[in-house]
């Protein structure tokens, strides 16, 4: 788990992340503590840690609501990984580790990082679990489609789906 300060620090650590902001993101929440002000122009932007956090938190204005935000977050993660891979990964991991809450030891993470030699962020595939956005009492919920999730998992692992009908 990485908290807000960890996101800011990790993004700043790699010199920002370049993303294509799909539209002008503008939002104010004076009740947040501290108040949240988002104003990010549309187009390709190099986001520092503070702006990256705002980009990741923004949820209004996407045609497909929260799913749009998830897609934007996935785009951001790919761009951040691509940027981080251009650095000496062990030094980035060591510095970022203090911002990560995990039960995985630093040495285990560094060993796993060794598997990333020659890895390209272009090979990252992302998925959104099948389901349906459902509003309820002014809140938005995402109801997972168990059958769809099972079929996706089977597909990803090259297995045949089994109908229980």
Role assignments for model-derived ranges:
Residues 2-3, 108:
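Short, glycine/acidic-rich beta->alpha junctions
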Residues 65-68, 84, 100, 104, ...:
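A general boundary/transition motif marking the beginning of the first structured unit of a protein
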Residues 101-165:
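C-terminal solvent-exposed extensions
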Residues 1-2, 22:
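Structural motif
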Residues 86-100, 106, 113:
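Alpha-helical membrane-targeting segments
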Residues 8-88, 92-95:
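Flexible, polar/acidic helix-loop-strand segments at domain edges
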Residues 1, 54-55, 125-128:
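Structural recognition of the beta-strand scaffold that forms the well-ordered cores
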């Amino acid at each position: 788990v990485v908290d807000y300060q960890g996101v800011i620090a990790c993004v700043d650590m790699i010199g920002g992340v370049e993303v294509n902001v799909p539209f002008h993101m503008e939002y104010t929440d004076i009740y947040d503590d501290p108040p949240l002000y988002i104003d990010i122009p549309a187009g390709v932007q190099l986001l520092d840690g503070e702006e990256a956090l705002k980009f990741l938190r923004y949820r209004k204005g996407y045609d497909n609501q929260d799913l749009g935000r998830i897609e934007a977050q996935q785009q951001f993660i790919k761009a951040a990984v691509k940027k981080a891979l251009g650095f000496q990964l062990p030094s980035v991991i060591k510095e970022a580790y203090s911002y990560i809450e995990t039960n995985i030891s630093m040495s285990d993470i560094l060993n796993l990082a060794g598997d990333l030699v020659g890895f390209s962020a272009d090979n990252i595939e992302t998925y959104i679990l099948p389901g349906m956005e459902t509003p309820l009492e002014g809140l938005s919920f995402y109801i997972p489609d168990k059958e769809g999730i099972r079929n996706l998992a089977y597909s990803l692992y090259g297995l045949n789906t089994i109908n229980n009908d």
